[in-house]
Each structure stands twice: as C-alpha cells, then as structure tokens.
C-alpha cells in the first residue's frame, strides 16, 4: 500500500490483537467492562493507524453508499469489507497474513493465513448481524443503477489508490459491488447473499 508505514502498521496490528478477541463479547455483553475497555483502546489505535497512513478502497466505497443510500459510514464499511478483502487479498498476502496472526489465526503459509482472515471477517460480520445491502433495505435495481457512479465517486476520493490492489471503475463495479458474473460466487455471497445476480 502506498501510505503504509511501520508506525501505522504497529498500531493497526495492536488494534487487531485487541479487537479480534473482544468485539463479539462487547457486542453480545454490553456490560462486559473488560471487552469494552479493550475495544476502546483498539478503536483508538485503529484510528491512529489510519490517521497516519490514510484509508483505502473500503472507505472510498463507503462514502458514496452513505450518500446515496443513507447508510452510516461504519456500517457500510462492514457491509463491504469481506468483498473488498476478497478483491484485494491476492495483492498483499503477507500483509493479510500479518493481520491474521494479530487476529489470532494460524496457518501453514501466508496465502493460507490471508484466506483464513477473509473467512474469519466474513464470519465476524455474520456473527454481528451486519446486514447485506438488501437486508438493509437497499433496492437491488437502484444499487445496480448507481454502481458506476459510486465507483467513479470512490475513485475521485483518492482512497482506492491506497489499496493493495488498485482498482479501476469497472473492477469496483464488478469485483466489489458484485454486478458482473465474472467474479466468483463466494464474493457475491459475501457482498449480499440475498441477491440473485
């Protein structure tokens, strides 16, 4: 990634070590003070990390989704994160593997760890009831209609240029927003299991 640096990386990995084992508990047990404390520290570290490195594709895509469909920024990030990770993972397997280790996963190779992390984040989104765009109430026809514009708006933000795999507008529409049949079915399911493509 263009803006990655050792300072931001250390903060991001520390945040993952805190958030990974505590997010579900903080979500399910709002009075769990230890989990909430870990989440506050992890969230602060994550914020410091991206403040010192910038953001990438998922944030760039979340802005137009929020503008067009009135989805809160954090929620739209969560909705898209598995799809963005699947799109990006092949361009930075060692970095994803570092994140997987920080998250508490183990594996035989960087590639296996990177894929395990994508699966773990998909499961996390399911466990936390992160809705698909359709479950949130977004009309598929309107989503498809606005996908090219949202892709252009994301690119104009500059954020996708920081992604490990830098997309063009067509790749955002096809590879992240899931419009075309050229991407694998797992990505479609990760983006929105309720939509038939």
What do the PLM-derived regions correspond to, one by one?
Residues 1-2, 26, 46, 68, ...:
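Alpha-helix C-capping/helix-to-loop hinge sites
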Residues 4, 28, 32, 49-55, ...:
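Intrinsically disordered or highly flexible coil/loop and linker segments, enriched in small
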Residues 13-24, 40-44, 58, 62, ...:
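Predominant activation on well-ordered alpha-helical scaffold segments within soluble catalytic domains
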Residues 106-197:
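C-terminal charged capping/lid subdomain of soluble metabolic enzymes
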